[in-house]
UniProtKB/Swiss-Prot annotation:
Gene3D superfamilies linked to this entry: MFS general substrate transporter like domains
Ranges annotated as spanning the membrane: 15-34, 46-73, 80-99, 105-126, 138-159, 165-184, 211-231, 243-264, 276-298, 304-326, 338-358, 370-390
Protein's UniProt keywords contain Chloroplast: no
Encoding gene (name): ltaA
Gene Ontology MF, one: antiporter activity
Pathway(s) of this molecule: Cell wall biogenesis; lipoteichoic acid biosynthesis
Membrane topology of the entry: Multi-pass membrane protein
Protein name: Proton-coupled antiporter flippase LtaA
Organism this protein belongs to: Staphylococcus aureus (strain MSSA476)
Main location: membrane
Pfam families from the UniProt entry: MFS_1
GO cellular component, one term: plasma membrane
Cellular location(s): Cell membrane
Length: 396
């Protein structure tokens, strides 16, 4: 009994520390990717094309690394992989201090940061306890979202004081996360190493066994990300509001998401499979309706209400979807499988803005991007709704 209590305490301590490490690394990512490089063209000689390329390469590196990181963790162990990641992140961001306007350093740092964050995510996802998955995944996604947003806002404030003087803060945050890592005892599901050919075959096998999940993993991210390029224009040109009022809408959505992740996500635990199905299906349908509604709204107060509803639903849909995916994963392949899943999700987030921007540009109508995003959620609702109904009938 005492050994069990000590083990539970150790697991809880490790989970909390990993949450803090995830928060800090996402904090650094928010500072650099969402804030620092976006401001560079306005305060240095860096061209917008360079920062846009850095932004894209960051997420390409993230998605590509996710695809193989589970296998690398099993082959080399967590200490080597994570330490390498921290070294890459710290060194690359440290270079930004000395070369704040170097195109090579800006792109290189973005790529290295994308690689460095990948193993932390995979370890977090694979270490979640099954009987507490909804609750713990709520905490994981909350740490991710809070880190990104607070990092972005914090860096925005520092840039207003001086555009490049506080660049050292990014590498400092990574250094703190790196130090905290040495107080964590990370365990993998197994440590079996395989030849490269065997690992490649396993990637193909994992992919084939989870094809059912790929539309949801890929298209959810694409549907949301498609709106990113047009939302500022939608706010200022269609709703005719200031940047501050638009920011308030983002904050309201973020607060709704945070509240849902912290308090509503635990509803997923110890509930029936049909409850989980209901949350996922309701989320897809509600997203379709709310996003479609945005195309007809010109009142900022209604937009704020919709933003709150989207945030609240997002905060419970993510843990529910994660729990649904977890049921398909073999217990000894968690790192590899979550890595592949994250890679597919990252690819969806990359193609979403591309489609959203192109649709608006070629049709010259912002509403068409809203219709495109809503249509994706309709397709997901029909596809997975059919699966849930068929699966429910089989269970009977």
């Amino acid at each position: 009994m005492q050994d069990s209590s000590l083990n539970n305490y150790a697991n809880h301590k490790n989970f909390i520390l990993m949450l803090i490490i995830l928060f800090l690394m996402e904090f650094a990512r928010g500072m650099y990717i969402l804030s620092y490089i976006n401001f560079l063209p306005t305060v240095t000689s860096i061209a917008v094309a360079i920062t846009s390329l850095a932004f894209s390469i960051h997420f390409i590196a993230d998605a590509s690394t996710n695809f193989v990181i589970g296998f690398l963790l099993k082959k080399f162990g967590t200490k080597i992989v994570l330490t390498t990641g921290f070294i890459l992140a710290f060194t690359s961001l440290f270079l930004v201090i000395w070369f704040p306007a170097s195109p090579f350093v800006i792109i290189f740092s973005a790529m290295m940061l994308g690689i460095a964050v990948s193993p932390i995510w995979v370890i977090m996802l694979s270490s979640v306890e099954e009987d507490k998955r909804g609750k713990q995944m709520g905490y994981v996604y909350f740490s991710w979202l809070l880190g990104l947003l607070v990092g972005m806002v914090f860096m925005n404030l520092l840039i207003k004081v001086h555009p490049t003087r506080f660049a050292f803060m990014m590498s400092l945050v990574v250094l703190i996360a790196w130090i905290l890592y040495y107080f964590v005892d990370v365990k993998l599901t197994n440590y079996n190493t395989r030849p490269v050919k065997a690992q490649l075959r396993q990637i193909v096998d994992v992919t084939k066994r989870h094809l059912l999940l790929f539309p949801g993993i890929l298209l959810q991210g694409a549907a949301i990300a498609a709106l990113v390029p047009i939302l500022p224009t939608y706010a200022t040109k269609v709703i005719n509001v200031s940047t501050i009022e638009y920011t308030v809408a983002i904050i309201i959505g973020g607060i709704g998401c945070a509240v849902s992740m912290l308090f509503l996500s635990k509803l997923i635990d110890n509930r029936s499979r049909n409850f989980m199905y209901g949350v996922i299906l309701s989320g897809f349908i509600l997203y379709m309706i709310l996003i479609f509604t945005l195309s007809m709204i010109v009142n900022i107060h209604i937009v704020w209400i919709i933003a709150l509803a989207i945030g609240l639903m997002y905060g419970i849909l993510l843990p529910a979807w994660n729990t649904f995916m977890a049921r398909f994963i073999k217990s000894d392949e968690q790192e590899e499988t979550w890595g592949v899943f994250n890679s597919i999700q990252g690819f969806g987030s990359m193609i979403g803005p591309l489609f959203g921007g192109l649709i608006t540009q070629f049709t010259n109508n912002l509403n068409n991007t809203f219709y495109f995003s809503a249509l994706i959620f309709l397709v997901l609702a029909v596809f997975y709704g059919s699966y849930f109904i068929a699966n429910r009938e089989k269970a009977k």
